[in-house]
């Protein structure tokens, strides 16, 4: 997700046209990432509420997806598939039947999970009417991804501002309106199934041609490029200013967790302590994406923002004085 966002920002800054085939391959990898991420989340969420049977089943279904990622890119994670101007590796037609077979198996098993989720009384008791995030608050706090869509907000960068091959391949925005953890769960499972369909469509519609643009000149300094990508957790935005020697002068990324955390206090208000972990977990937080902390001195009113590096430095300094 992040490499796509970064590359697209640089490509916009440099006026680089990515070949259509490369855009289709990017879309396939992005949707494989969405599938494995949602299944990973489903297992962790089930573990949080003590339902380890779902954890084991979700991660069992996820494993062939990881195998597909490795088959295509050479890596289970940190795929390294994107380069500025295209992709590093192709998906030849000879690989298509194998991919389609694995996708069919994943689809059947994910449908079984969806059927279980919507009817299982234990899951409904723990997830329905828990961690409620009203639609108006999801809009007011500009929440993103499944967190927003579970509260009835039809927002999805793939549809609102298409990139890669999403302007050519049908993409459905999965929305639920019960505004609770159950809704966020159903949104993710339905998105998993739609991602499988998107990959199939990409394989069927993939055009012939090169997978990398011919870039013959350095990108001039002072150019600005921005790009948004619909990550599994929601919109990820990248901002790039080009510098000298074909290097970035400034690069800023905003991950969706930073925005979605704003909704957690509303979700947990009035809930039991036992429901706080799953309410927080329902946004699929990535705390390494939000490594900053704001503190307010209650005596002076002074406000300070600390990064992860600042906090580690202060921690080491304190212990070195003991």
Where are these regions (language model features)?
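Active-site bordering "gate/hinge" segments
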Residues: 1-322
């Amino acid at each position: 997700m992040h490499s796509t966002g970064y590359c697209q920002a640089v490509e916009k800054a440099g006026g680089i046209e990515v070949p259509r085939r490369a855009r289709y391959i990017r879309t396939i990898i992005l949707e494989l990432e969405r599938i494995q991420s949602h299944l990973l989340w489903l297992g962790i969420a089930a573990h949080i509420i003590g339902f380890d049977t779902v954890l084991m089943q979700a991660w069992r279904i996820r494993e062939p997806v990881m195998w597909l990622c490795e088959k295509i890119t050479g890596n289970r994670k940190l795929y390294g598939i994107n380069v500025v101007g295209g992709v590093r590796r192709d998906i030849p037609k000879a690989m298509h039947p194998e991919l389609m077979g694995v996708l069919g198996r994943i689809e059947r098993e994910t449908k079984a999970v969806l059927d279980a989720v919507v009817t299982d009384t234990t899951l409904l008791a723990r997830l329905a009417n828990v961690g409620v995030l009203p639609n108006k608050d999801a809009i007011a706090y500009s929440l993103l991804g499944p967190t927003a869509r579970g509260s009835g907000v039809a927002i999805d960068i793939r549809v609102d501002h298409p990139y890669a091959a999403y302007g050519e391949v049908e993409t459905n925005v999965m929305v639920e309106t019960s505004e609770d953890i159950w809704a966020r769960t159903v949104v993710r499972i339905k998105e998993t199934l739609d991602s499988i369909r998107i990959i199939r469509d990409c394989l069927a519609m993939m055009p012939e041609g090169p997978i990398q643009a011919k870039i013959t000149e350095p990108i001039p300094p002072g150019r600005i490029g921005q790009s948004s990508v619909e990550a599994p957790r929601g919109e990820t935005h990248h901002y790039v200013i080009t510098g000298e020697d074909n290097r970035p002068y400034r690069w800023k990324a905003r991950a969706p967790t930073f925005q979605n955390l704003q909704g957690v206090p509303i979700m947990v208000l009035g809930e039991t302590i036992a429901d706080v972990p799953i309410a927080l977990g329902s946004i699929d937080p990535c705390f390494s994406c939000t490594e900053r902390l704001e503190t307010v001195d209650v005596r002076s009113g002074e406000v300070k923002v600390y990064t992860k590096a600042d906090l580690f430095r202060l921690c080491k300094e304190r212990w070195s004085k003991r």
